[in-house]
Amino acid sequence: NGDVVEICYDNAKSYAGKSGLLGWDHLAVRTKDLKETMAFYAGLGFNMTGNGYLDTPDGRLYIAFMTCKGFTLELIQLVGPAVNDPDTWKSGKIDHISLDVQNVQDAFMEARSKGYEMVDFGIKELPLFDHGCRFFTIKGPNGEIIEFNQINKF
């Protein structure tokens, strides 16, 4: 589909000491058919590491996490009356970039203090993984959505 993602590791390393950034967390990809997409990535060597759903005002959001050699994909399919063709989504097939943080509350306060364009005005929680996760999102300089994510350990 022409989407290209490049991660600059050296720049992320120098930023990590300031914000508790631990590194890459996952890349979220929107899909029309979750099962077909999961089968495709399984064929490439990815294994399912988590799944679930979230009811939203737009419909039910089905989510699957698949991992291969430390790289995690979040596959997303929205089912419901407000669903439109993924080819018309403004952000393309790649929904967001997610970064793993040590303390999501500290990262949130730092993002606000730096004047980043906040997409979420508070920290959200999802009942995914063993103990859930907490996250918030900002917009990058090109309109890309960047999620700061902390997976709860207990």
Predicted features, each with a name:
Residues G23, Y62, K69-F71, K93-D95, ...:
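Residues that flank catalytic or metal-binding motifs in active/ligand-binding sites
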Residues V29-T72, D106, S113, F129-H131, ...:
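Core segments of cupin and vicinal oxygen chelate
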Residues L73, D106, F121-I123, P127, ...:
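Generic preference for hydrophobic/aromatic residues in regular secondary structure cores
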Residues V101-Q105:
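Short proline/glycine-enriched turn/loop motifs at strand-loop junctions of beta-rich domains
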